[in-house]
Amino acid sequence: MDETPIFFNMYPNKTIAKKGNKTILIKTQSQEKCRISVILCITADGEKLPPFLIFKAKEEGYIEKNLSELNLVKNKKCYITCNLNAWSTEKIILRWYKNIWRKYLESSESLCEGFGYLIMDKAPSHITEESLAIMKNDKNLISFIPAGLTRFIQPLDVSINKPFKDALKKEYINYCINMNEENLKITREKMIEFVCKVWYDENIITKR
């Protein structure tokens, strides 16, 4: 399991200009600093569990309630929540655990027979006493990746996050080209659609 930020503005970092130009104007969006966090998780046999999206908004406010009515959310293709900084907290990690990881262990798709082995980094929201107690009580063995080593031995950091974000960026750029609008803003609903489409695409990462 890992969390990764995703920005609403995913423009390419290159442009085309005449050789010798001293000034090059590049248009950007007003959303260039807007982001969400996504909690991703894959199993040892390549099963992709539903992504958990964290938006920047009031917790349990009208934005969260409206997003919860989307078909992708109601059909449990993904889960969403909100808080004021779009980062995970102990409460959010426990929601992820209860709605995604625990349900996977209890499902017929799981090969774990009720036991779980969870690998994650040592982010503050991952190592609270309450969350660890609940996870261990459910017969989970938990391994923490030491700080500074996630890019070497964290499976998602090493193999998944980059192709996922590259595919997400490609989806975003194609959408912007097809829309052909200046100052196009990506809605929260569209971001959910992007994330789910890319995550469940069997040609991008692992199997589904």
Where are the predicted features?
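RecA-like helicase/translocase P-loop NTPase motor core
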Residues: 1-208
